[in-house]
């Protein structure tokens, strides 16, 4: 067998496109070595896997937030992969309208962000990382990005025009941090 070395890519020379990230993610999903990996997998712009297993309280807040968002109708999803211009990320919780789901519901990963993307902050998160994810979700079509801080029991809301005083989505977050 002769290998055409012109076609062999040994190094990644530039950040991957959304489409290339999507292919990389689907390949990982189909790889038996990753079938039972606990926690979510994200892929940075260079195609590297990033794994961030959550703690118990993080999971509780995530589940409560999913229940709250379910009151809006539509679909609530957890750790759903989204291919963005800045990497493939899996927000802790997302909410999508029926219209969004009819257009994008069968994609794996999603090639656009649902209307609401929420990140539940973990001690390992950095301000820079959260800012980048917020920008990535908004650039991919999210209407709002919620940053949920379990330790300080607060939420930040971001829209396409910047920080929001409150969310445009009428949900009761009072029981989120009990």
Task: Mark where each language-model region is.
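Gly/Pro/Ser/Thr-rich low-complexity, intrinsically disordered segments predominantly at protein N-termini
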Residues: 1-178
């Amino acid at each position: 067998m002769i290998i055409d070395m012109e076609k062999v890519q040994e190094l990644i020379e530039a950040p991957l496109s959304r489409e290339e990230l999507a292919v990389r993610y689907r390949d990982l999903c189909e790889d038996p070595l990753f079938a039972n990996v606990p926690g979510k997998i994200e892929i940075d712009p260079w195609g590297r896997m990033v794994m961030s297993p959550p703690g118990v309280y993080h999971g509780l807040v995530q589940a409560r937030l999913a229940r709250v968002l379910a009151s809006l109708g539509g679909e609530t999803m957890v750790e759903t992969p989204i291919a963005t211009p800045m990497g493939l990320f899996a927000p802790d919780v997302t909410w999508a309208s029926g219209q969004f789901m009819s257009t994008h519901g069968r994609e794996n990963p999603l090639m656009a962000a649902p209307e609401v993307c929420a990140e539940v902050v973990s001690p390992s998160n950095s301000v820079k990382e959260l800012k980048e994810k917020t920008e990535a979700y908004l650039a991919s079509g999210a209407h709002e990005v919620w940053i949920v801080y379990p330790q300080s029991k607060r939420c930040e809301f971001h829209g396409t025009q910047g920080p929001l005083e409150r969310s445009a989505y009428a949900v009761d977050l009072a029981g989120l941090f009990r």
